[in-house]
């Protein structure tokens, strides 16, 4: 194996903690474009990490947090051969100081995560994950999030008809 020089550029805003929605766009070696929709805001603690922190977890080897790696594997894709793009919007809600507020905020963001994953699938993006959530959708917050992502994923444009 020969050494190579790799490069990663990112905006400092990616370091802000709080509740974010994000989309991974993965260009696989076989030219497929795959997508993964996620959020920050733990289900098991009061933490709402930054997208930067979550990025490393997604592609790492810890079984409880490497969901992107798992989905790529299920699609027969080796991450080392891919090109990645992470688009994150947030923080749409601040990190909470107590568990009850954290859970309320997490649930609002989870509803938006599910709606965005479904909207991207309907728009023709090959979304690898199905977000399972029964929480109520905050429609106005979702509209803002969808519009923000539509700037990067144009087929998400709201139906104006």
Name every feature range the model reports, one short phrase each.
Residues 1-34, 40-161:
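Boundary/linker segments flanking structured domains
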